[in-house]
Amino acid sequence: MKKKPFYKVLYVQVIFAIVVGVILGHYYPSLATEMKPLGDGFIKLIKMVIGPIIFCTVVTGIAGMEDMKKVGRVGGKALLYFEIVSTFALVLGLAATHILRPGVGFNIDPATLDGKAVASYAAKAHGQSTVDFLMHIIPNTMVDAFAQGEILQILLIALLFGSVLAHLGERGKVVTDFIDGLTRVLFGIVHIVTKLAPIGAFGAMAFTIGKYGVGSLVPLLKLIGTFYLTSVVFVLVVLGAIARFTGFSIIRFVSYIKEELLIVLGTSSSEAALPQLMEKLEKAGCSRSVVGLVVPTGYSFNLDGTNIYMTMAVLFIAQATNIELTWMQQLTLLAVAMLTSKGASGVTGAGFITLAATLAVVPTIPLSGMVLILGIDRFMSECRALTNIVGNGVATVVVSAWEKELDRAKLRQALKGGGEVAATETAGV
C-alpha cells in the first residue's frame, strides 16, 4: 500500500496547527482569542456523536454475550483496576510535591487572597455528595440523558437495553442488527469530523495562548514542570509496568494512539478523542463488549491525570501559604480525593471544579488558595487529559486480557504499525 505524503498524515497536520496557534496567540493575541469558536465547534461535533456511539457499542457488545454474568464480572474487574491505579496516581502526586516542593518560597498570606475569581468553581462543587453523584447516574428520561450528553446515564440505559436484547435472543436480532449498522454509520461520521481536528486544535491553542499569554506561566513554572514530570513518570513507570506485565510496550501503545493524543493536546478535552480511542482499541484486539464497558466508565472513574493534579495542587497551595499538614490530614486528603475525583469528566475545567470540591472538605487549606493556580490551570489541563486518555486505553487492554478477550496477534500487529494501515483502510468511510 502506497504511503501517504507526510503533509496528509493527520497527526502531522495537528502538530502544525498547534504550532501556528501558539505563534498567532503570542504575536496577535486579540485576533487569536477570536479563534475560540473553531476549537469549541470541533469539540461540539465530536460530543454530538459520543452518546450514540457509547450506547450502540455497549448494546451490541452486551447483546452478543452468552453469559450475562460476564457484564458484572467485567464491570467489577474494571472498577477494581480503577481504584488500584487511581490510588497510585494520588499517592504519586503527593510524593512528588513533597520531594520537589514547588510551593515553598511563595510565603503568601491566605488573608490577602481574593476568592471571588474562583467563586463560580466553588459553587459548582458545593454539595456534591456521594449520594448526589449516584442519583445523578439515573436520568430523568432516556431522551434527557442523550440531550445532556451524560455519559454515565447513557451507559446505564445501554446496559439495561443490551441486557434485555440478550435475554430476547433471536427475537431481538432485528433490533441488534439495526444498532450494529447504526454503529458503523456513527463511526463513519467520526472519520469525517476527525479530518477537521487540525482546525479545532489551531483554534483552541490560539485562544489559550492569546488569552492567558506565555508570560502567565513564568511564576509557576516549577509547579507546571513538577506536574508534567510526575505525569510522564506515572505513564512510563506505573502504566509501563502494568503494560509490560500484560505483554505490551507502553511506548508503542502511546505511539499507536498518537493522533488521538494530539487531538487531546490541541483541545484539552479527552472527550474529543473518545470515539476514535474506542475504535482504535477494537482494532488492537480488545473485544467490543469490554471496550464499550471500560472506556465510558473510565471517563468518570479512571482519571489518572486528574488524580495526580488533585493531591499535587492541594499540597502546593498548602506549601505556598505555609500551612503544615499532618500525615493524618494528608491521608484524609487521599480518601476525599478518591471520592471527589469520580465526579470529574473529560471536559476542560472539570479538574478545577473537582479541586474545589476536595478543598471544601479539607478546611485547613483556604478555598481562596485556588486563585494561585487559576491562571495556569488551562495549561495543566492538557497534561491531565493526555494522562487520562492513556490510562483509559491501558485499562481497556488490561481488562480485555483478564477476560481472555484480547487478540494478541492483532495487538502486536497494531503496535508494530498495523494501526496506520487500519486507519488508512477506514479513511474512505
From Swiss-Prot:
Q: Where does the protein principally reside? A: membrane
From the Swiss-Prot or TrEMBL record, state where the protein is found: Cell inner membrane
GO molecular function: any one?
Answer: fumarate transmembrane transporter activity
Here the disulfide bonds are none
Q: How does it sit in the membrane?
A: Multi-pass membrane protein
Q: Which NCBIfam families match?
A: PRK01663.1 (NF002461), PRK13027.1 (NF009587)
The entry's function note states: Responsible for the transport of dicarboxylates such as succinate, fumarate, and malate from the periplasm across the membrane.
Q: Which family does it belong to?
A: Belongs to the dicarboxylate/amino acid:cation symporter (DAACS) (TC 2.A.23) family.
> What's the protein name?
C4-dicarboxylate transport protein
Q: Which organism is it from?
A: Burkholderia multivorans (strain ATCC 17616 / 249)
The uppermost taxa in this organism's lineage are: Bacteria, Pseudomonadati, Pseudomonadota, Betaproteobacteria, Burkholderiales
Designated gene of the protein? dctA
